[in-house]
Amino acid sequence: MAAKIRKGDKVIVLTGRDKGRTGEVFAVRPSEGRALVRGVNMVKRHQKQTPQQEGGIISKESPIHLSNLALLDKDGKPTRVGFKIGKDGTKVRIAKSSGAEIDG
């Protein structure tokens, strides 16, 4: 299946405790159908001390299911993603709301 949401995309959270928050995708896990969004879905984890790292309670991002994310178009509005074949034969992503091509 083609990736509708990719690393570097600006997205908005549709459901859950972070509903309405926006951020940039910095990792996608296609096998799990989840993505990590910077500054969204933060959880606290207890980190054991190591020689290189200090121990304590740290905050880090937790993965969000792709169905709970929507891509933001150039105007900053959430949109669904479609695909079309470009003039040179490559598959490009398009915003369903405006029909504009999505860079990526």
Curated annotation (Swiss-Prot):
The keyword Transmembrane helix does not apply. PROSITE patterns: RIBOSOMAL_L24. InterPro entries: KOW, Rib_uL2_dom2, Ribosomal_uL24, Ribosomal_uL24_CS, Ribosomal_uL24_KOW, Translation_prot_SH3-like_sf. Keywords: Ribonucleoprotein, Ribosomal protein, RNA-binding, rRNA-binding. GO terms for molecular function: rRNA binding; structural constituent of ribosome. SMART domains: KOW (SM00739). Pfam families: KOW, ribosomal_L24. One of its GO terms (biological process) is translation. It comes from the Bacteria. The keyword Ribosomal protein applies. GO terms for cellular component: ribonucleoprotein complex; ribosome. Part of the 50S ribosomal subunit. One of two assembly initiator proteins, it binds directly to the 5'-end of the 23S rRNA, where it nucleates assembly of the 50S subunit. One of the proteins that surrounds the polypeptide exit tunnel on the outside of the subunit. Belongs to the universal ribosomal protein uL24 family. This is Large ribosomal subunit protein uL24. It comes from Afipia carboxidovorans (strain ATCC 49405 / DSM 1227 / KCTC 32145 / OM5). The lineage of its organism: Bacteria, Pseudomonadati, Pseudomonadota, Alphaproteobacteria, Hyphomicrobiales.
